[in-house]
Amino acid sequence: MIRFSFPDGRAEVLVTGREDGDLRAAPRADRESLVERHLAATELLLLEQVHSSTVVSAEEAREQRRQGDALVGFGPAALGVLTADCVPIVLADRGGAVATVHAGWRGLAAGVVEAAADRLGSEVEAFVGPHIRACCYEFRGPERPGLEQRFPECFHGDYLSLDAALGRVFEEIGVTIVGGLDECTMCSGRFFSYRGGSRAERFLTAARSGDRWC
């Protein structure tokens, strides 16, 4: 389990690992207890992730579980994303509003990161969680030409770099990376990896606003 605080305290982040178990299958009460203990969060909100560019507010997610791939909120509730190769991203603005984003290649191409950042205020910073990297992400699908057109620098031979694609998006929208985990989910062994055989299991990345806003 890994904790990260944004440098100015605007947001707090928690990332679970393989040793913490499958957080998708875990009972809701266990997930809630986890974020309460490690993030001092009042609740955990999640979405039914569908590889889209849909952004859902914490208030909407609290009413009922909704489909989408980015959650935006403010305050002591933890916003979460479940992944096993896609990129889990935490965005936070200078006012303490937070977004958690699920970004695989489909989401990046659809503009989920831009859509989430648009729902935040100024001076947005980012934490980038563990995901599959170019060392292991062989990609030969028919979608490749479209991805190469949008992200010309994202392919190294037959291997896809989600980092390169994400870096281009951040540069275009003016988001600064202030933290992350420089590990590949497939070859590090510390996290679940869909391509590494973890077809159903997922690890959790969760975040809430910093203490001064809670």
PLM region descriptions:
Residues 1-214:
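Active-site microenvironment for binding and transforming phosphate-containing groups
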